[in-house]
Amino acid sequence: LAQGGAMLSETEAEALIFGHAAGNDLTRRDLQAEAKAARRPWDMAKGFDASAVVGAIRPGPLADGAIRCTVDGAIRQEARLSDMIWPVPAILAYLSRLVALCPGDLVFTGTPAGVGPLHRGETCTVDIDGLDPATVTLD
């Protein structure tokens, strides 16, 4: 985000957007399962070291295009950005009612159907038309 704000309308939220990037917010399912079993919050399943893989940020608006995720070159997920459930301004407006948004915030906005496990040694790439890919090889 280029600017921050709270309690925003969708129009106000859209004006905060600096640019777009491909990204992958990884989840450690082992930590998630442990936390759920213990009836504890599972934030750390999403917030562990190196859990947010992000490509280069391209300033400006993003045209509709494809988003895809490949694992070792095989397509696992693929959809049009226009098929995502919530438009980005709606997501930002909703978030701004829960927490203040700040300049520099990166917001991951969802994924197409097909989420699945990744294993050590696999290379996962998230690619969005018009953006640099976000790639990670799991150690």
Label every PLM stretch briefly.
Residues L1-C102, L106, G114-D139:
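Catalytic-core "active-site belt" of small-molecule-metabolizing enzymes
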